[in-house]
Amino acid sequence: MLKNRIKLVCSDIDGTLIKSDKTIGELTYKAIHELVKRGIHFALVTGRFKTGVLPVMETLSLTDKEISGVYDNGAYVEVLGQPTSSYGVPIPLMFEVSKFASSYNARSVLFSGEEWVVEEKDKWWARINGFYEGRGVCEPFEETVRKSRMRNDSEPIKLVLRLDDDVKMAALKKELNILYPSLSFFLSHPDILEVSLKEVNKASGVSAIADKLGITKDQIMSFGDFDNDVPMLKEAGFGVAMKNGTQCALDAADYIAPSNEEDGVGKTLFSLLL
């Protein structure tokens, strides 16, 4: 039975844990606190940079010393506040990808330290700056790299490509996969293309946490809704997709939960685990 087996619960954030208005359902809030109370480890697994996750932790009334985190789709992992693994795309390669993507009119965004960075303001500036609580910076990317090295950041610099043309995005993704076989390119949103090392994804991040805690694959339960959640849904002993999820996520899951708008994570945890 799941109740006697699961020792680590992992959850995606956007479209899974939180509702479209960025709130967390009452049942989900209670369920996560009950997990922590019972000694079942909980981890947030997301494409967001850690800075973008801190408001979610605040909403949960939990700190990074109480729960673990997989950030940047697996590029940076912390276990109970301690950095565990960090796998960034080499800077020269990152700049090369950014330059090529500009030929498709894709916009590059870097995430570094507590900042997100663009080289020039565009139509996404206000929306992203609001999402990241005013931490946006407009500067040459070379300066971003210099500052990160001066700070000796644990979390690697992350590159994201934004393009709101589905046809162009598909063509760009296809060509990048051919040109850069050592990298992985995947959508975390219809207009957001993530860039990472080939072997790095949410599943590798979850595995890093499990290894550190001495937890086996069959003792992991994971929640997700999008294509980039598929690796961790498959990696977990019990994968749960949200009803609002993509077809790829639904196909990869062992169980379908109510949607994020219906407090699906909380309902499922209380129904199956707590």
What are these regions (language model features)?
Residues 96, 100, 104-107, 111-223, ...:
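Conserved acidic, metal-coordinating active-site core of Asp-based
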Residues 1-13, 30-33, 37, 215:
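Non-catalytic pre-domain segments flanking phosphatase-related domains
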Residues 3-8, 25, 178, 194-274:
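Mg2+-dependent phosphoryl-transfer enzymes with acidic/Ser/Thr/Gly-rich catalytic loops
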Residues 3-6, 39, 64-66, 105, ...:
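A general structural motif
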Residues 13, 48, 74, 224-226:
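Active-site metal-binding loops of divalent metal-dependent hydrolases
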Residues 20-24:
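Conserved ATPase-coupling elements of RecA-like P-loop NTPase cores
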Residues 26-127:
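Active-site phosphate-binding/coordination module
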